[in-house]
């Protein structure tokens, strides 16, 4: 072994905040379907707790043996609208409570899959699940919800988009004692992926295996430190440096994924290449963009820098791992990135620029606080804009937005932990009410017809 490479790895972990953001076990609940809701919930609880009983323990073992921090251990399950749809119940809140209880028993950080896939229309189960989201997120701690409202092959379900604006508002209202924290556990997608290890949008797709291990890496600090060594050099060198660094980060992710897979006797699924920031200084995607040459993220050139970063991360990552998937790109969550927070506060970064940035990276308008009195129709229109970007560009986009109750532009909303602090951002106050209320479907784009 090369001593320099060992020292480099130690430095990346200790000084540059390299870590494994999550080991996520995906679990199929299709065999838990039952027309009796009580029986279905018992099956769900038993299946999750039995399947993932050693997940936290194995994560800690790998962490101590290899010296690699593993920040979160998580579980994702089959979208609950599919499982609960067989019952005659008119609310799925009890299913959310069962998931929360299972998460507590396991000692995991989050459990994703209180989800519905409605890109082309809603079943009875989808409608009940969506209407259950506000209460479910208000009374549970670890359950995350997601709704897929569009895809490139089907277009955008504008009825669901309209409804999700109302659901987000109601979720914020029911969790107003925590500044609308319930909305931080709710994602609205276009082109959602089935193997996403990251919360709050993770669910276990119906095309996945019985159980699977997916890993999400994180290393913005490592990329920034590498770029500090090539200051003033051309974009060719910058791209190559990012690529080589992403290769190293992903190699570590694959090592952990394979080791977890072997010890848990669960197949290895994918490594998600996403650069996921934290609120800690030096662990920021915004700081990478500024290192590339921007005085402050949000100024002209931001989108080009982000596009290059995203592409170089993918190119480096795919060479390092046999199975890459999930969202795989650079995350730009405002509240979780110290550089983004600073840019919003000083006026360099606004909502319109963030929308532009989502065209070239993963995933979308993420962890953004807006005034609490924002109309539901405006939130629906924001979802529609992001869904359109995803559907037309054949990529995953999403909205995780918090209309913070009682807060106005310039206020700070504290979520704590990895979710950080969100400055309340200004929105366009012109009405989108008539637009949001039209309903129906926006047809799939012409270039979606590939057959």
From Swiss-Prot:
Belongs to the UPF0210 family. This is UPF0210 protein CLH_1879. It comes from Clostridium botulinum (strain Alaska E43 / Type E3). NCBIfam families: PRK05313.1. CDD domains: RNR_PFL_like_DUF711 (cd08025). Homodimer. InterPro entries: UPF0210. Gene3D superfamilies: 3.20.70.20.
């Amino acid at each position: 072994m090369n001593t320099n490479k060992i020292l480099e790895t130690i430095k990346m972990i200790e000084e540059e905040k390299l870590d494994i953001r999550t080991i996520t076990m995906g679990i199929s609940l299709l065999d838990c379907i039952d027309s009796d809701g009580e029986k279905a919930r018992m099956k769900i609880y038993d299946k999750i707790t039995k399947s993932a009983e050693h997940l936290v323990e194995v994560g800690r073992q790998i962490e101590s043996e290899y010296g690699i921090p593993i920040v979160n251990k998580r579980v994702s399950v089959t979208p609950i609208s599919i499982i609960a749809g067989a019952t005659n119940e008119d609310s799925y809140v009890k299913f959310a409570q069962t998931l929360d209880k299972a998460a507590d028993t396991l000692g995991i950080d989050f459990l994703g899959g209180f989800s519905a896939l409605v890109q082309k229309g809603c079943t009875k189960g989808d409608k009940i699940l969506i209407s259950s989201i506000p209460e479910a997120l208000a009374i549970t701690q670890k359950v995350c919800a997601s709704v897929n409202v569009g895809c490139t092959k089907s277009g955008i379900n504008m009825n669901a988009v309209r409804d999700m604006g109302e659901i987000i508002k109601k979720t914020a209202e029911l969790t107003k004692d925590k500044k609308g924290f319930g909305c931080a556990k709710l994602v609205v997608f276009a082109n959602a992926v089935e193997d996403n290890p990251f919360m709050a949008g993770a669910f276990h797709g119906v095309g996945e295996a019985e159980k699977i291990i997916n890993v999400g890496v994180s290393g913005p600090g490592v990329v920034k430190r590498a770029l500090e060594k090539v200051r003033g050099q051309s974009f060719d060198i910058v791209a190559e440096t990012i690529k080589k660094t992403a290769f190293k980060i992903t190699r570590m992710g694959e090592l952990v994924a394979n080791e977890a897979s072997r010890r848990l006797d669960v197949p290895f699924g994918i490594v998600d290449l996403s650069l996921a920031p934290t609120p800690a200084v030096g662990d920021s995607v915004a700081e990478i963009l500024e290192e590339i040459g921007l005085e402050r993220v949000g100024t002209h050139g931001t989108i080009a820098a982000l596009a290059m970063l995203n592409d170089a991360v993918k190119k480096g990552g795919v060479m390092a791992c046999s199975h890459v998937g999930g969202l795989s790109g650079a995350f730009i969550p405002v509240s979780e990135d110290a550089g983004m927070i600073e840019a919003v506060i000083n006026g360099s970064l606004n909502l319109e620029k963030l929308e532009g940035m989502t065209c070239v990276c993963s995933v979308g308008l993420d962890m953004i606080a807006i005034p609490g009195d924002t109309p539901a129709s405006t939130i629906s229109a924001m979802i529609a804009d992001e869904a359109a970007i995803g559907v037309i560009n054949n990529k995953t986009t999403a909205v995780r937005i918090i209309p913070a109750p009682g807060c106005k532009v310039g206020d700070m909303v504290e979520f704590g932990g990895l979710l950080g602090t969100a400055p309340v951002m200004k929105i366009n106050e012109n009405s989108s009410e008539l637009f949001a209320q039209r309903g129906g479907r926006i047809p799939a784009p012409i270039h979606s017809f590939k057959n």
